[in-house]
Structure formats: C-alpha cells, structure tokens
C-alpha cells in the first residue's frame, strides 16, 4: 500500500499573482492610482511614506503593529498615509496572526514590529503564513544605519555586535529578505520585496533602519509605478501532452473522483477545478484544509475526504475509486491521519500548481493548474458513476437528540444550532483542536467563508486570525470557535477587536484542557487552570466599546445567547462561553488522535 502520493511538495510556489481568499474568489492587487493623478511633495517623499504608499498599492489598507523604539518614527510615517490604517496589537505574535487572517481574506497582509525582540516574537506567525502560502509583508524597525559594520553592542540583541541573528532566523520562513540601511537602494529593495511576496505568495521580511524612515530622497518623489506581475504561462506542448495522458488514464476508469487540496488557492485554480467538476460529472470531495474553496452546494459534492475521519460515506467512495484526481494536495501526518490513507499511487493523478503527475507515469512540468483543468474540462468524458454510487449508499445524518431541560449541553447539539447561523454574510474561523473536526461537519452556504490553519497547527492562531480576517472583511460576521487552552495563549487581542469596533461572535469551548493533545497522548500537563472567561473579557472590555458576554451550560441557554447575539447585540463583539464535559469530543477526534499517536510512537528504524 503506497500512501505517499502527492508528497513531493518541496517546489517553490508557482502562482503569478496574489493569493486568492477563501471560497476561491479572486483577490486582485489594488491598481495604483494613475501617475498623472498623483503629486508627491518632497517633504512627503520619505522612506516611511514611500513604504506606506507601496503597501496601499499592493492591497494593504490595515497594518498590524506593536511599537518599539526602533520602529516609532516609521510608525509615524505609516500613520501619515491617509489610505493606511495602523492597528496596534497587544503582542507581536498576535500581530503576525492578524496579518495572516487579513491575507486570507484580502489577499495580502502586513505587520510592523521592532528589532529582534519583536522580530523573533512574530517569527512563529510568519512561519505559519509560509506554510499556508500567504503573501505577508513583515516589516521590522532596525538599528541605526551608522551601527552596521561597527563593533557596537545594541539593546534588543543577544549581546553580540553581529546584527544578523534576526535576519538569519527569517531566511528560512520568508521567500525574500530586504535589509534597508541606506537610502540609495531603499526604493528598489522595498519594491522587490513586496512584488516577490505577491508573486510567490509567501511572506517577506523588510528591515528599515530607524534613522532612515523620516528622510526624504529623490527616488521616493517619482511618480509611482504600478506593481506589474507578469502572468506565468503554461508550456503549450507540455500542457497538450499532460491533457492527453490524463484523458487516456481517466477514460479507462470506471468510477473516477476528484479531490481538492489546499494548494488550489495559491494556484488560483478554484474556479477551473469547479469547471472540471461540472464537465466531468465526477464525485467531488475536498481535503480538510481546502474546505470552503469550492461551493458545497455543488450537485456532486460528497464532503470532506480525511481518511478514517472523513464525512460519512466520502472515504468509501474516494478510496474505492479506480482513478482519483488530487488537486494541490498536501499529504502530511495530520491530513493523512497518521499516514493511514488507503490510496494507491498507480490510481492517482496529482496536480500541483506547476506540474502534473499521472499515476506511475511521467511528470509534466511548467503547466499551470488552472490551464490544465480548463483544457481537461473541454475534452473529458462525462462519468457520474462514483457520484451515483455515493447517492446509493448515502444515508442522511440523524439529528442529535434534543437535550432535556437543564441537561448539560453536548457538543453535537451545539453545532446543530451553529449550522443555522451560517449564511453568505458569515465566515467561520476554527482553532486547532476539536473545533477542526466539528467545524468540518458544517455545511457551508454559498459565500460563507471558512479558514483554519492545518499545516502549521499553532494553538492560539485563531484569536489573531479572527482579528485580521474581520478587519479585512467588515461585511462578514466572523464566527470563531476557540478552545480554552488555545484562548489562554493569545487572549490579549480581544482588546484590539474592541478598539476597532469588530462584531465577531466568539464561541469559547470550555472543556478544561488541551483536548486534542489528550486524544493523542494524555497526561496531567493537558489539564489547565480554569478561568472566569466571561469575567476576563468583561474586564478587557472595561466599559469601552461594544461587548456582550454570556456563559451557557444548557441547550436553552445556548439558543437564547445565539438569538441575543444575532439580534439586539448584532453590532457588538459577542463572547459566548460554552461549558462542555471534558470528554465530550467528536468521534472523529477520537479516531484521528489514536492514529496520529500511533504514527508518533513508531519505534526507530533498525540501524
């Protein structure tokens, strides 16, 4: 049994454009204002103002920041840009997570921190954005330009005269690094960094010396040149050969299926993937980290393919198929449920953003995923067998038993009520943990956003990501599902949500510990100190801004809280603490946890 299909994920990103947001919609780079319409006064032609203008022209209108002595002057000049809003965060980690969430909705995000103490604090969030193929611009206020090349020891360092420690850390989690410590090439370095982030759909690092941000320079007073990203093109002969080989393979199959993966977004191929589904009639499934990339109301949609923890009847159809197209998959230990997928390489067509591998046959390079799917959809033979088989075996899910009056709330009952809240005007943010599995079961209506961080899986990510996503998409009401353990990591930026008038509904799942860790390997370290979470949020609120909190233990209290949050408190940040039993978890987490535990505990190979 070969479970390693599609694991060749080490190629560089290949999209020629900014990352598209959730549900496969397209985020475009904001067009620069025509140069004839812009007059830049020399006093405004500072390095800081130039950087601010270029961020706006790239599509960033909100920057998440934490002040520090090396970036204060730079922050002044960013604030002076009328089209740029500076959002102060409580810590650098959350600023990075917020930029991550912002990029998921808007297509590009940015954060500003100070040298080393800020840079190394935000590094974890930047690594997560790198793993998720998000264009994120991390700006650091750096040392005075006169201190480079000297033997001086500065504060915020590890006590050595070498200032490159921060840069070396960022080199592994960004696709480009710019150290701006002189004015002559600052214009070129900044533009190269931002355009590289957009082109590669990965984070970049820009360090700006603290004494340069306020200085004008003639290169910054020029008419702005729009960012121009030449579109990448497929090799026509290679594309034709790949389509021919794929058609030959698929047309021999009896019951082929399609499975979408997380790289559909970075490849800008969500719409083309749906076109192929329409033309082929194949059963259509999505990997968990691609949920929301295609419309779940598609007539041939059969759910989430996640091996042993797939939605009902989905894995049976996928794994029994004699041909499967995997579009942009990432097969890691989490997505493969401890490497237990029952897939065979000889049955798989693996389509990555820039190449196609047909079963055990050839790999075709220099081919864009979207071009491949569109050409294939024009010529593929329609075959609905797999979907018809799914339709035959499908049994609608039974509704959870209604809780008796004053009976403790159950998690499956809770999500029955969450389902009713979803619409095109909502978005779901799911924290690492049991929320992954419970939110996967939600049926997303058209236009409903959905995000979670599966590849990196950093607990606490969702607080900052919720802040950033809500700031980028004020037209949507974000529903965030956060476990108590994760919430304790990053709770501070509830404050920033309130300062910015956000109207998110946060469901705090209070079950007394790190539930996902418990199911992988239990121990006393997975038990956490219980907090008065509603009291904490009330204290953060402190009478400033619009905030409403509730603590629910029973179904009737949950229904009442949801009603209040969606009616009279619809313009408030709403925080609903849901008390659940510590062992009330999804059956999918129980299965997944045991398989991941087995994968983690494999003995060393013999030497």
From Swiss-Prot:
Annotated cofactor note: Binds 1 metal ion per subunit. Binds 1 thiamine pyrophosphate per subunit.
Cofactors: a metal cation; thiamine diphosphate
UniProt: substrate binding residues: 69, 156, 517
Cystines in this chain: none
Top enzyme category: lyase
Alphabetical keyword list: Decarboxylase, Lyase, Magnesium, Metal-binding, Pyruvate, Stress response, Thiamine pyrophosphate
Any one Gene Ontology cellular component term annotated for this protein: plasma membrane
Induction of the gene: By anoxia and abscisic acid (ABA).
Tissue spec: Highly expressed in seeds, and at lower levels in roots and siliques.
Binding site for Mg(2+): 484, 511, 513
MF GO annotations: magnesium ion binding; pyruvate decarboxylase activity; thiamine pyrophosphate binding
Family under the similarity heading: Belongs to the TPP enzyme family.
Function statement: May play a role in ethanolic fermentation during anoxia.
Protein name from the UniProt record: Pyruvate decarboxylase 1
């Amino acid at each position: 049994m070969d479970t390693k299909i599609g694991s060749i994920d080490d190629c560089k990103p290949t999209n020629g454009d900014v990352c598209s947001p959730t549900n496969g919609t397209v985020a475009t780079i904001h067009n620069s204002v025509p140069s004839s319409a812009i007059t830049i006064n020399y006093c405004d032609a500072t390095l800081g103002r130039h950087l601010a203008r270029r961020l706006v022209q790239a599509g960033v209108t909100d920057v998440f920041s934490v002040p520090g002595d090396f970036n204060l002057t730079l922050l002044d000049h960013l604030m002076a840009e009328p089209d740029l809003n500076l959002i102060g965060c409580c810590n650098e980690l959350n600023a990075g997570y917020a930029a991550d969430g912002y990029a998921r909705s808007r297509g590009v995000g940015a954060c500003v921190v100070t040298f080393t103490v800020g840079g190394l604090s935000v590094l974890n969030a930047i690594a997560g954005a790198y793993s998720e193929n998000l264009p994120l611009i991390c700006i650091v206020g750096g040392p005075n330009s006169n201190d480079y090349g000297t033997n001086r020891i500065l504060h915020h360092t590890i006590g050595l005269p070498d200032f490159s420690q921060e840069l070396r850390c960022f080199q592994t989690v960004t696709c480009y690094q710019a150290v701006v410590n002189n004015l002559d090439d600052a214009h070129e370095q900044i533009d190269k960094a931002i355009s590289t982030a957009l082109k590669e759909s990965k984070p970049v690092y820009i360090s700006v010396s603290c004494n340069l941000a306020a200085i004008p320079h003639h290169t910054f007073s020029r008419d702005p040149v729009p960012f121009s990203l030449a579109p990448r093109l497929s090799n026509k002969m290679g594309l034709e050969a790949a389509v021919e080989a794929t058609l030959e393979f698929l047309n021999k199959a009896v019951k082929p299926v399609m499975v979408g993966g997380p790289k559909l977004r970075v490849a800008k191929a969500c719409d083309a993937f749906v076109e192929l589904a329409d033309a082929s009639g194949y059963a259509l499934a999505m990997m968990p980290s691609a949920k929301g990339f295609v419309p779940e109301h598609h007539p041939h949609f059969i759910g989430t393919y996640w091996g042993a923890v797939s939605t009902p009847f989905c894995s049976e159809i996928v794994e029994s198929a004699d041909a499967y197209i995997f579009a942009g998959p990432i097969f890691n230990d989490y997505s493969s449920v401890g490497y237990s997928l029952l897939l065979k390489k000889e049955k798989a067509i693996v389509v990555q953003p820039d190449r196609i591998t047909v079963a055990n046959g050839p790999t075709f390079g220099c081919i864009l995923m979207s071009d491949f799917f569109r050409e294939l959809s024009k010529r593929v033979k329609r075959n609905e067998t797999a979907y018809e088989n799914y339709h035959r075996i499908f049994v609608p899910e039974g509704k959870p038993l209604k809780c008796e009056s004053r009976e403790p709330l159950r998690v499956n009952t809770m999500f029955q009520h969450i389902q009713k809240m979803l619409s095109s005007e909502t978005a779901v943010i799911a924290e690492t943990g049991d929320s992954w599995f419970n939110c996967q079961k939600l049926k997303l209506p058209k236009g409903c956003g959905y995000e979670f961080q599966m590849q990196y899986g950093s607990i606490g990510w969702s607080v900052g990501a919720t802040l950033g996503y809500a700031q980028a998409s004020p037209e949507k009401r974000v529903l965030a599902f956060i476990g108590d353990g994760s919430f304790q990591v990053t709770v501070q930026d509830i404050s920033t949500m309130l300062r910015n008038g956000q109207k998110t509904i946060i469901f705090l799942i209070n079950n007394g510990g790190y539930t996902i860790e418990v199911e992988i390997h239990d121990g006393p370290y997975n038990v956490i100190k219980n907090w008065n979470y509603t009291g904490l949020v009330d204290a953060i609120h402190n009478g400033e801004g619009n905030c409403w909190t509730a603590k629910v233990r029973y179904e009737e209290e949950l229904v009442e809280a949801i009603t209040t949050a969606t009616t009279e408190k619809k313009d408030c940040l709403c925080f609903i603490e849901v008390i659940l039993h510590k062992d009330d978890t999804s059956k999918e987490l129980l299965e997944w946890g045991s398989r991941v535990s087995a994968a983690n505990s494999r003995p060393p190979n013999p030497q």
